[in-house]
Design a protein with these regions (language model features):
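Hydrophobic/basic alpha-helical segments
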Residues: 1-202
Length: 202
């Protein structure tokens, strides 16, 4: 992009080019192939860092600090790729749960039925529970177990962590809008939620 689109000076136009030409490649079927470890995620995140530097004309400025990078993402309303992958995962799971996709939950996931052996259980009727768990050995950890990295298994706990007021939203458009706000709020200061706009069409 830096070589072929060097003539683009407007931030909004440069941002649109990045979204349509680069980020769209990362988002194609990301619920299937998304990286599940920090090393691979960081490699993809570096591509977006370079793109943001190009958009903001700050190619000589370091974004090595996580706080700086998140702030730059916020300045041009681009979620960090790791959060964007979570967004896509949760949007798809939401459509499965509310039967907006012709896909069923796997056999090992079901909704919490109110019975728990734990005294302090924070699950509700929209929480998902798994009947199986990846086995951990000295050679296999939760993060390296194939089941732990599959879409439904890695996503159901993220779904449970969302506020129930968010999970109760059935409209996919409204859910996406509110989920973006929630993800931004988790990335920046709690009182910064309303200090920037979230495009509803991305």
């Amino acid at each position: 992009m830096r070589r072929n689109c060097h003539f683009v000076n407007e931030k909004a136009r440069a941002r649109s080019l990045y979204i349509s030409l680069v980020r769209s490649l990362f988002e194609s079927c990301s619920i299937i192939w998304r990286p599940t470890n920090q090393t691979l995620t960081a490699k993809l995140e570096r591509i977006q860092k370079q793109a943001i530097k190009w958009i903001l004309k700050e190619e000589n400025i370091s974004y090595s600090s996580c706080e700086v990078y998140v702030q730059k993402c916020k300045d041009i309303n681009l979620l960090p790729l790791s959060a964007r992958f979570d967004l896509n995962d949760l949007l798809f799971l939401h459509k499965v749960i509310y039967e907006l996709k012709p896909v069923n939950l796997p056999f090992y996931l079901s909704f919490f039925n109110g019975q728990s052996r734990l005294r302090s259980c924070h699950l509700d009727n929209l929480s998902l529970v798994s009947s199986i768990h990846p086995k951990s050995t000295h050679c296999t950890t939760r993060t390296s177990n194939p089941l732990a990295n599959t879409f439904f298994y890695r996503t159901y706990s993220k779904w449970n962590s969302l506020p129930i007021s968010l999970r109760e939203i059935k409209c996919p458009v409204h859910f996406k809008f509110m989920l973006k706000k929630h993800l931004w709020k988790s990335l920046v200061m709690p009182d910064a939620e309303s200090s920037f706009l979230i495009d509803d069409d991305e």
